[in-house]
Amino acid sequence: MIQPANRVTEIQEYYFSRKLKEVAKLNAEGKDIISLAIGSPDMPPSKQTIDKLCEVANNPNAHGYQPTVGIPELRKAMAGFYKRWYDVELDWATEIQPLIGSKEGILHVTLAFCNPGDEVLIPNPGYPTYTAINKILGTKITYYDLREDNGWQPDFDALEKMDLSHVKLMWTNYPNMPTGGVAKRETYEKLVAFAQKHNIVVVNDNPYSLILNEHPMSIMQVPGAKDCCIEFNSLSKSHNMPGWRVAMISSNKTFISWILKVKSNIDNGSFRGIQLAAAEAMLNNTDEWHRENNIQNYRRRRDIAEEIMKVLDCQFDPNQVGMFLWGKIPEKYADVEDLTEKILHEARVFLTPGFIFGTNGKRYIRISLCAKDEKMKVALERIKKVFER
C-alpha cells in the first residue's frame, strides 16, 4: 500500500482551507455566511495597475519565461518603495529579491539557511505557515512568547535564558499578525543586537506596515540590520493585490544570493505583465490613494469591528494596526472555538479563533476588516440578535 511521505503526517491541512469547505457547504444550504475571517483585501488595485497588466498581456512578445531574479523594472520599483516609505536605501540589483508571494519565500529562506535539525525561533502567537514549513523541512521549532502585558513584543530576558547555540533563524512579524501589535524602534534595535550577539538571522515579516498605520517602519532602518536580518514585504495588503502573488525580500547581497540559488532551482519569475503592473502599482500609489485605501476605508470598517467586539464583551487594544482586530474573550466563555462556532452557526458570521495562531491565542478572536462596510454592518446586527437577546 502506497503511503505519503512522513512530512505529510507532520502537518495538517491549513485551518482556513478546511474551514472554508464547511462555510461553502453552509452557503450551499442557503445560510449566507458572512466571512470576517481571512485577510484578503476586497478592494481592487489602482486603475493604472490593471491597465498596465492588460497592456502587457496584449503584447505577443511578453509571454515567455521570466528570470527568477525578477526584471529590473520591478526590482527598481521595490527599492523605490523602501526609500519612499521607510527611507531605506537598497541596491535594487543585489539587495532585493521578488517573490511569488511571501509563503513561498518562507520556504526558500528556510531552505537557504537551515539544515534538518537546526533550530528556529517562532512567535506564539504567530502566522501558522512559519510552523508548517519548518515541520515539513525537519527543523527544530522553539516557540517564544508574545504576551499582551508586554505589548506583544519579544521578551528578551526570556530569550537570553534559552540555549541559543543551535538557532539559525528567528521569525518576527511587525506590525504583528494576529495581534496588531506595533514594534517600537527600540524593539527593532534589540532584535538587531540579539541577532549580532548570537549569530542568528532575524527574519521580519512586514506586510501590514501601511494599513491603519501613520508611521510605517522597517527593521532595515536600524544600522547593521542588513548584515544580520532579512525582511519580507508584500503588495497583497498595501496595494490590494493578494491574488497577484507579488512579494519581496530585502537583505545583504550574500543572503540574497543564497536565497536566489534555492529559488532558481524551484521556480521562474512570474508573468512579465504581473511584474510590470506591480512596478506600476508602487509608482502610482499616490498619497491620496494610500490614504483612501489603506487608512480611511479600513478605519470605517475597524469602527464596526470594534462594535462587534463590544457586543461580545471582548477587550481590545484601540492602538493596534493592520487589517484585523484582535480581542480577548471574557471569562464567561469556556472556550474560544465554542464561541466562534456559536457565532458561525447562530449568527452566520465566520470569525477566526485565536488558537490557530498558537497557545497564547486561545483566549482571543480575530476579526478581518476585508469586507464591505455594508456586510460588516449586517454581521454586527446578526451578532447583536444572538448575543443581546
Residue ranges of model-derived segments:
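Intrinsically disordered, tyrosine-centered linear signaling motifs in cytosolic regions
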Residues: 64-65, 208
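PLP-dependent class I/II
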Residues: 2-4, 9-14, 19, 23-34, ...
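Conserved N-terminal alpha-helix of the aminotransferase class I/II PLP-enzyme fold
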Residues: 65-100
